[in-house]
């Protein structure tokens, strides 16, 4: 039985003299929640456009459920939620949803769509052009789910949502994943990717430079930090001269020492008789991991 929902094999995409995507390969299994991340211009949008069949690779091939992306059977299995929401003026939300449901052989029921997306009775009877930003996001999510897709592709899905709406949204996404649906999303909220994604694919300069769970990616970088509070008059000069201390940051009322050897820094704090209180050892953040990966990739080019 085929386990992969998406297979990308040796794919390159050229635009005139620019290479937007350079020889990437990966596969995403059914039921997986994967985040595609990277700085602006990294190739993320091009990759997603090729997965959707909107662009064709210059080299290599992409298969969705072992078929080409523009196959009609494949299109019926995909739901897409874009960052920019286009509405159909003159129609009410329930009319738009019924129209979209009619395009698919096995659509979700209206009751299921309302339950999954938190659309209210008032939302359903509102004309599209009168929707608020939050209502438009809920409609966009409902349209992506209308055909009961096996693969959901979400572009910055929680932009404009408040904290409770985001929490509910990701609860729904995990429930869909538990049903075997595959979810691919992009986001600039790295904490969201850390919390929601089972797997992260990080792109920079058109290359796939990291692929793994959030924990696996964080573990690829060595930087950690030791933080503590300190008496305001105490100097850290004698601590700063040691090579294990890479950087000293004063943030709010805490002192943060970046290092690749936390054990040595802890020993130095006591050895130098630093009167530190509330000492904490912290792992690298996903943001720090991505900055190091992006910088390392530029240096290698």
Swiss-Prot record:
It comes from the Bacteria. SUPFAM superfamilies: P-loop containing nucleoside triphosphate hydrolases (SSF52540). CDD domains: ABC_DR_subfamily_A (cd03230). Disulfide bonds: none annotated. Keywords: ATP-binding, Nucleotide-binding, Translocase, Transport. One of its GO terms (molecular function) is ATP hydrolysis activity. The keyword Nucleotide-binding applies. InterPro entries: AAA+_ATPase (IPR003593), ABC_transporter-like_ATP-bd (IPR003439), ABC_transporter-like_CS (IPR017871), ABC_transporter_ATP-binding (IPR050763), P-loop_NTPase (IPR027417). ATP binds at residues 38-45. Pfam families: ABC_tran. PANTHER family: ABC TRANSPORTER ATP-BINDING PROTEIN. This is Uncharacterized ABC transporter ATP-binding protein YvfR. The gene is yvfR.
């Amino acid at each position: 039985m085929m386990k992969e929902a998406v297979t990308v094999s040796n794919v390159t995409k050229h635009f005139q003299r620019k290479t937007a995507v350079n020889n990437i390969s990966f596969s995403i299994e059914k039921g997986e929640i994967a985040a595609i991340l990277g700085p602006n211009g990294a190739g993320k949008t091009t990759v997603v456009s090729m997965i959707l069949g909107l662009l064709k690779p210059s080299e290599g091939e992409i298969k969705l459920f072992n078929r080409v992306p523009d196959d009609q059977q494949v299109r019926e299995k995909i739901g897409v939620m874009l960052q920019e929401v286009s509405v159909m003026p003159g129609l009410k939300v329930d009319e738009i949803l019924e129209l979209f449901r009619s395009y698919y052989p096995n659509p979700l029921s209206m009751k299921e769509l309302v339950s999954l997306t938190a659309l209210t009775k008032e939302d359903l009877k509102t004309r599209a052009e009168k929707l608020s930003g939050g209502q438009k996001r809920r409609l966009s999510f409902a349209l992506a789910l209308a055909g009961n897709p096996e693969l959901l592709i979400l572009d910055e899905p929680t932009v404009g949502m408040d904290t409770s709406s985001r929490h509910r949204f990701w609860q729904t996404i995990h429930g869909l994943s538990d049903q075997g649906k595959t979810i691919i999303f992009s986001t600039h909220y790295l904490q969201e990717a850390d919390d929601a994604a089972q797997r992260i694919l990080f792109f920079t300069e058109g290359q796939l430079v990291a692929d793994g769970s959030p924990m696996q990616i964080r573990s690829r970088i060595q930087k950690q930090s030791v933080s503590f509070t300190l008496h305001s008059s105490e100097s850290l000069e004698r601590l700063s001269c040691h090579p294990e201390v890479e950087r000293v940051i004063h943030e709010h009322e805490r002192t943060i020492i970046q290092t690749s050897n936390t054990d040595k820094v802890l020993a130095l704090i006591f050895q130098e008789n630093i009167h530190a209180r509330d000492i904490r050892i912290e792992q690298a953040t996903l943001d720090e991991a991505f900055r190091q990966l992006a910088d390392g990739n530029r240096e290698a080019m």
